[in-house]
Every structure is written in structure tokens, then in C-alpha cells.
Design a protein with these regions (language model features):
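N-terminal signal peptide c-region/cleavage motif recognized by signal peptidases
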Residues: 10-12
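Short N-proximal segments of mature Sec-exported proteins
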Residues: 16-82
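Sec-dependent signal peptide recognition
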Residues: 1-2
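Short, compact, well-ordered microdomains
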Residues: 73-104
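Active-site-adjacent structural elements in enzyme catalytic domains
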Residues: 107
């Protein structure tokens, strides 16, 4: 499984850099493959990473990113599905950061 490639890929977000670990460093093409796969565990791993990143960003920013009213769990996944379909070479982390920007939560 592609998850095994735990990442040492760095990304710049706003004026700060950070290391992206795990699935977030994979390309959106892997997200799309997981979505199409019959392996529900693999799909859940990608979804959990994205939800964890969003939760951490919300915590770090004092909850100022999103509420359940602004976009629910399924809305998040649908947005990321569409984004990754359109941007297969982008990293999953960048896709989630783009979603944060859409929700007004990018620093």
C-alpha cells in the first residue's frame, strides 16, 4: 500500500514551512485510486488523515476555521474528491490546505 511511504516532503504554507508526514505527502492521484478501490481500509486511512489535518488546523487556530454548519464530513470528502480528480499531481496536503483556504482558514 502506498501508505508505507511515510513522507519527508516539505511544504510551504503561508510564510512557514513544515514537514508533512504520512499520507498527506502522497499525490492526489493516490487519493483518487483509494476512492475507486474496494479496499475500505485504504480509503478510510486517506479520509482520516484529511480529517485529522483539518482538526489540527482548527485547534491551532482556536476553532476559527470551520464549523459543522459550514461543511460537514461528507462535504469535505466530496470537495477533496473533486479537487484531487482535477489536480492529480498535487499533494493531498496541498488539497486540504486549498480546502482550508476556501473555508477561510488559511493563515
Amino acid at each position: 500500500m502506498a501508505m508505507a511511504a511515510a513522507a519527508l516532503w516539505s511544504s510551504a504554507a503561508s510564510a512557514q514551512s513544515y514537514v508533512v508526514w504520512g499520507i498527506g505527502a502522497e499525490r492526489c492521484a493516490a487519493w483518487v485510486d483509494a476512492k475507486r478501490s474496494s479496499d475500505k481500509v485504504q480509503r478510510a486511512a486517506y479520509e482520516t488523515w484529511a480529517h485529522g489535518f483539518l482538526t489540527g488546523a482548527g485547534f491551532e487556530r482556536g476553532g476559527a476555521i470551520m464549523t459543522k454548519a459550514s461543511m460537514d464530513r461528507d462535504g469535505v470528502l466530496k470537495w477533496l474528491d473533486d479537487y484531487c480528480e482535477a489536480n492529480p499531481r498535487m499533494s493531498i496536503e496541498r488539497a486540504v490546505v486549498a480546502l482550508l483556504g476556501r473555508l477561510g482558514g488559511e493563515k
